[in-house]
């Protein structure tokens, strides 16, 4: 950038670059991220973006979940749609706790323990994969929410201790925010939702053609294992 170009590695010739604008984004140098030198930063106009507050996050993801409910082919029971605000609040709360808990802070050995809004949005992206046939009660919807949170946050954790810490966070939140006992809600652990086993879809419908896109809980692990071997 100082000299207006760079050398070609193959021909060793200097290539002049003209009419180029550099746009970059970065986070503060913590959690394994390197410091960017002032010598390099002097080429840029720095713009700092304040993090979204919880009220803004609630509005953003609340609208996404509301859009999802409205655009389903068939209306869901009120007992499920009434969970919207609590689901959004709980997801933001869990995201904040995972980010700030000293037990899950990034270290040199766990430098990937970094979460951002992209991870938060993926929870809702997973929820919106479900269809009317994915759940028939609010308990099914809560299990879907817990599954998506586990896939986004827990799957990144590399030690049993860290995974147990997250499990306790999720169970406590389920009891406090939704008044559900985890052991009574989840009969088969770990939670597993997918859309690749048509014989396990709701209503015992074995028509892969009709319901090949149903994203639902898979409780028969032997059938899951058998289907995975078939795909191999």
Regions found by a protein language model. Give the residues of each.
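Alpha-helical lid/collar subdomain of P-loop NTPases
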Residues: 18-23, 27, 42-45, 52-232
């Amino acid at each position: 950038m100082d000299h207006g170009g760079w050398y070609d590695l193959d021909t060793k010739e200097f290539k002049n670059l003209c009419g180029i604008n550099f746009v970059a984004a970065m986070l503060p140098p913590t959690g394994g991220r390197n410091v960017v030198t002032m010598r390099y930063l002097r080429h840029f106009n720095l713009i700092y973006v304040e993090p979204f507050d919880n009220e803004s996050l609630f509005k953003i993801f609340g609208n996404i979940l509301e859009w999802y409910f409205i655009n389903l082919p068939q209306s869901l029971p009120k007992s499920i749609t009434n969970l919207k605000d609590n689901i959004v609040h709980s997801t933001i709360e869990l995201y904040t706790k995972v980010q700030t808990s000293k037990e899950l802070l990034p270290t040199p050995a766990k430098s990937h323990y970094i979460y951002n809004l992209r991870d938060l949005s993926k929870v809702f992206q997973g929820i919106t994969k479900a269809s009317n046939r994915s759940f028939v009660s609010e308990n099914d919807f809560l299990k879907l929410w817990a599954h998506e949170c586990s896939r986004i946050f827990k799957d990144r954790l590399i030690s049993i201790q860290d995974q147990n810490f997250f499990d306790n966070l999720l169970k406590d939140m389920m009891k406090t925010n939704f008044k559900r006992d985890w052991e009574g809600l989840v009969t088969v652990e770990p939670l597993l939702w997918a859309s690749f086993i048509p014989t396990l879809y709701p209503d015992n419908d074995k028509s892969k053609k009709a319901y090949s896109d149903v994203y639902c809980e898979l409780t028969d692990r032997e059938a899951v294992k058998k289907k995975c071997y078939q795909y191999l």
